[in-house]
Amino acid sequence: LVLALAMYLRDQSMPLPKKLVMMSPWTDLTASGPSYQENYENDPLFGNTRESMIYNGEYAGKQDPKLPYISPLFGDFHGLPPMLFQVGSLEMLLSDSVLAAQKAKEAGCDVTLTVYQDMFHVFQLSMDKLAESRAAWDEVAAFLGK
């Protein structure tokens, strides 16, 4: 949602946020990235069932899932503010962050991508329970404080 909204704001010549923070973003509702297969059995939240991806139908409705405001991976990244992507290495959504970060860099954006090893979807919500979660929030604070 963060990327889709930023693209929309830019396209409407509206003010953009100064920075974008994305935690395990779902940027490709077509599920075409390699991690959808590679992490199929590793992802404790989405893995081992395609039914877990059912939300894409509710979100996209009858719209083409490749529309940039639905799947920002297929959009234009030019002119977007600095962005931080955080993602776990076990996520089916890993390639969504990796590919979006790559595309943003190619468009000249200031991009930070951090892949947290052996972490799952939105591990950041574990707050003080996991060292990786604490590190992720510290990274967000440092990124926003720049």
Each predicted region: which residue ranges?
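Alpha/beta-hydrolase superfamily serine-hydrolase fold, recognizing
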Residues: 1-146
